[in-house]
Amino acid sequence: MQLTHQLDLFPECRVTLLLFKDVKNAGDLRRKAMEGTIDGSLINPTVIVDPFQILVAANKAVHLYKLGKMKTRTLSTEIIFNLSPNNNISEALKKFGISANDTSILIVYIEEGEKQINQEYLISQVEGHQVSLKNLPEIMNITEVKKIYKLSSQEESIGTLLDAIICRMSTKDVL
């Protein structure tokens, strides 16, 4: 149902992904996240192609956190920001964060060392059904993904969609 992954560069950190469908209280969850009463990033799964995309964003967020160079105020927001192909924080939050009308939500949280997130509490806050991450392709909107990342048909013929997305995410600080 969930995916928990230890970060290679930061073995003391674990990233957990929880996917929910048929969510009825996305607006309340968004408000709680903005108030800081929910530990985790609330992500719109329609723009996520693969869990690896999240792991790359989370790894970068932890790296910048450790360096004291995050561009946002919280680790949760930094993960969402790192999914974006550009450096506009508010645009990243609109496109990759959840909105009040969303019916699918991906919750991502990071635990470090002995620090534990109360997963049962987190799950209990969602009025919806937790589903396996294997359902992600059914939820994803390929047209929206291509639009957000400005992917060309030429790029798609050279490599995979995921490769192009990771490339966009990784090079935004360079360009």
Curated annotation (Swiss-Prot):
Q: Provide one Gene Ontology biological process annotation.
A: tRNA threonylcarbamoyladenosine modification
Which pairs are disulfide-linked?
A: none
**A GO molecular-function annotation:** protein kinase binding
Q: State where it is primarily located.
A: cytoplasm
Where is this protein found?
Cytoplasm, Cytosol; Nucleus
Q: In which tissues is it expressed?
A: Widely expressed.
Q: Name one Pfam family in it.
A: CGI-121
Keywords attached to this entry: Cytoplasm, Disease variant, Epilepsy, Intellectual disability, Nucleus, tRNA processing
Q: Which GO terms describe its cellular component?
A: cytoplasm; cytosol; EKC/KEOPS complex; nucleus
What quaternary structure, including any partners, is listed in this protein's UniProt entry? Component of the EKC/KEOPS complex composed of at least GON7, TP53RK, TPRKB, OSGEP and LAGE3; the whole complex dimerizes. Interacts with TP53RK/PRPK.
| Functional note | Component of the EKC/KEOPS complex that is required for the formation of a threonylcarbamoyl group on adenosine at position 37 (t(6)A37) in tRNAs that read codons beginning with adenine. The complex is probably involved in the transfer of the threonylcarbamoyl moiety of threonylcarbamoyl-AMP (TC-AMP) to the N6 group of A37. TPRKB acts as an allosteric effector that regulates the t(6)A activity of the complex. TPRKB is not required for tRNA modification.
As annotated, the protein's associated disorder is:
Galloway-Mowat syndrome 5: A form of Galloway-Mowat syndrome, a severe renal-neurological disease characterized by early-onset nephrotic syndrome associated with microcephaly, central nervous system abnormalities, developmental delays, and a propensity for seizures. Brain anomalies include gyration defects ranging from lissencephaly to pachygyria and polymicrogyria, and cerebellar hypoplasia. Most patients show facial dysmorphism characterized by a small, narrow forehead, large/floppy ears, deep-set eyes, hypertelorism and micrognathia.
Q: Record's family?
A: Belongs to the CGI121/TPRKB family.
Name of this protein = EKC/KEOPS complex subunit TPRKB
User: What organism is listed for this UniProt entry?
Assistant: Homo sapiens
